[in-house]
From Swiss-Prot:
Residues 21-275 form the CoA carboxyltransferase N-terminal domain. The gene is accD. Binds 1 zinc ion per subunit. This is Acetyl-coenzyme A carboxylase carboxyl transferase subunit beta. One of its GO terms (biological process) is fatty acid biosynthetic process. Its cofactor is Zn(2+).
Length: 275
């Protein structure tokens, strides 16, 4: 009289694995498709936040072609002071980034103009400046003098590299002296400050440019805002140490969005050469 109900087992669909890095969350909360973000030069389409670039990415969007001459590619850091764990950290960062150090120097063209370029990479020990980074900046300036070329430096650094102690701090004087020789030769030096430009880098070559540009929202300064607040026991103004704040107070000549940065550099170089 009563039939037994039949039940069917519904097999759950196989869980689809989403590739890592396919989506990226911006600080504004927007979820961005990685390929769209890359096409937009790694600038958020919702809030215009400028994500940090690797040195290779920066070179690719700045130089006319990827066919450039890398300078001093064989220079690599060593653990000169026997700092605990430093050798292992260097090896790990070299493997992760594919770089020898936190900076790449090169000669290439921008808008057809030959230039010497130095690009720092904050993904390598926070772009900190040790002996090799300082040497690359100094040699790039000397290369520019020998070949009568303008120098463009993209800074992205947390400051001096503590694992190299006084040897790292010495790079501040060395790079400043090299930039001084470039200036004496009457050659153009454009400094581009990107997020972050802090510590010994900001206190040396980063602020010695004939023209100083910055990307929107970049953190720029010597000590971090938290350290300053704890020292002076006062609340800092909103936006303190951001690129726009520094422009308002005369420390930066212009804040230029990444999409317009290459054209701006081309105009600056062209005007300097025409003069």
């Amino acid at each position: 009289m009563f039939k037994k109900s039949k039940y069917f087992t519904v097999r759950p669909e196989t869980k689809r694995e989403i590739p890592e890095g396919l989506w990226i969350k911006c600080q504004c909360g927007a979820i961005l498709f990685a390929k769209d973000l890359e096409r937009n030069l790694k600038v958020c389409q919702k809030c215009a936040h400028h994500f940090r670039l690797t040195a290779r990415e920066r070179i690719r969007i700045t130089l006319d072609t990827e066919d450039f001459e890398e300078l001093d590619a064989g220079l690599a850091p060593r653990d000169l002071l026997g700092f605990p764990g430093y050798a292992e950290r260097l090896a790990a960062n070299q493997k992760q980034t594919g770089l020898n150090e936190a900076a790449i120097s090169a000669e290439g063209t921008i808008g057809g103009h030959r230039v010497v370029l130095v690009v720092m990479d904050s993904h390598f020990i926070m772009g900190s400046m040790g002996t090799v980074v300082g040497e690359k900046v100094a040699r790039a300036a000397e290369h520019a003098v020998r070949n009568r070329l303008p120098l463009i430096v993209f800074s992205a650094s947390g400051g001096a590299r503590m694992q190299e102690g006084i040897l790292s701090l010495m790079q501040m004087a060395k790079t400043a002296a090299a930039i001084g020789r470039l200036d004496s030769a009457g050659l153009l030096y454009v400094s581009v400050l990107t997020d972050p430009t802090m510590g010994g880098v900001s206190a040396s070559f980063a602020f010695l440019g004939d023209i100083i540009l910055a990307e929107p929202g970049a953190l720029i300064g010597f000590a971090g805002p938290r350290v300053i607040e704890q020292t002076i026991r006062q609340k800092l103004p909103d936006g303190f140490q951001q690129a726009e704040f520094l422009q308002e107070h005369g420390f930066v000549d212009a804040v230029v969005p990444r999409s317009r940065l290459k054209d701006t550099l081309i105009k600056i170089i062209g005007m300097h050469q025409a003069g």
